[in-house]
Amino acid sequence: LNQDLTEKIAKYHAEFLDKIGSLYYSKENYDDFYFGKGSTYPDVNGSIGILFEQASSRGHIQQSQNGVLTFPFTIKNQLTTTLSTLKAASLLRKELLTYMNDFYFNNFNLNNKSKFNGIRFGNEHDKTSSYQLAKILKTHKIDVFETKGKKFKYYVPLKQKKSRLIKAIFDTNTKFEDSLFY
């Protein structure tokens, strides 16, 4: 469903960019499955992450393979996609809200099927790194608890609102449906 909503939103971007004569790339491939990319952060938080990559004018003006690219034109593209995002969000409001609601509701079902209750981490030889990781997790509203263990200092329960983000952070997935990406 995330990919379907991404495609629907992309149609608004295409419509708006067509009106100003901008070249763009949409849907040829979405590599929206690897959580190491910043554009997937909204995806693991119940939203729709869309990556916009604007060619740089390298200052005020640059010759490109598609002609002259100016700084004002790059700004115009960014503003245009901002406006198309607002229109898409407004017109797809109910679908987006339903998606977000279902995303968090389904977290409970996913958590009940998990083989693990939580994740323990820590390094007795590098307590600072463990502390900093716990601090970062907390900034993302992830529950982290200190433990009395000798090897592991922290515990992150999976049964919480941000369980998909937790799994994205700690999982070491190396198998993908499509292995052709960057």
Language-model features, listed with the residues they occupy:
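Intrinsic-disorder/low-complexity accessory segments
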Residues: N2-Y24, E28-Y30, Y34, T40-Y182
